[in-house]
Amino acid sequence: MHRGKGMKFVGDSRIPAVRKPNIPKDYSEYPGKTEVFWPNFLLKEWLVGSVFLVGFLCLTVAHPSPLERIADPTDTTYIPLPDWYFLFLYQLLKYSYASGPYTVIGAIVMPGLAFGALLLAPFLDRGPERRPWKRPVATGMMLLTLAAIVYLTWESVVTHDWEKAAEQGKIRAEVEIDTNAEGYKIAQANTCTSCHGENLSGGAGPSLVGTGLTAEEIAKIAKEGQGSMPGGIFKGTDEELQKMANSSPA
């Protein structure tokens, strides 16, 4: 019979099983390329986090968040603008194939396919290669998506009317409008309030509050028009025009 054939080693009861408690090494026993979690590693993390926190707080103090006037849901002329990380979706909804009757495609279907593909990427690309040039399909899709996001964001920034956006969101001083005044009733009768708002603070037309215009300039604009406002809208007499201009909150 060969030695060990058919035999099973079940242990030797004469050899004691020494179990030592899991005690961490002393600080002095660590080699030069390693370090203890506390205080070395964790203290460095805290210091880096503190620097970023202080920098972020200084940034918020130096550049506070821009505030606009109180939101008015009845103002149909207001053009909303999302945060910068949603600008590419905002621009996508401007195209004909993703807006109007096709809003569902631009708002749900296309982003859903993109984020769904991102979630399924680890399951679809199961190859052993990790170098980008060895994974042409995955790398190409990533670069195409990144290029589309950058282009749509840039296009949204370029085509947005920033001057109009700053003007429409400007916080204006509240001015009490006497709706019983004769000048206000004249403006209301000539449909001025339908464009400039019931409080003359702006609507489809610009605000008439705090414009700095003189009564003569207001009368001239009301008679001849200016910009997108055509002339001949005011149908009253010269006397009514003068009363309206003199009572303007400009």
UniProtKB/Swiss-Prot annotation:
Which annotated residues bind heme c?
C192, C195, H196
What molecular function terms (GO) are annotated for this protein? electron transfer activity; heme binding; iron ion binding; oxidoreductase activity
| Domain Cytochrome c positions | 178-250
Name the Gene3D superfamilies for this protein: Cytochrome Bc1 Complex, Chain C, Cytochrome c-like domain
Q: Which cofactor does it need?
A: heme c
| Physiological role | Component of the menaquinol:cytochrome c reductase complex.
Whom does it interact with, and what assembly results? The main subunits of the menaquinol:cytochrome c complex are a Rieske-type iron-sulfur protein (QcrA), a cytochrome b (QcrB) and a cytochrome c (QcrC).
Which family is it part of?
Belongs to the cytochrome b family.
Instruction: Provide the protein name.
Output: Menaquinol:cytochrome c reductase cytochrome c subunit
Q: Which gene encodes it?
A: qcrC
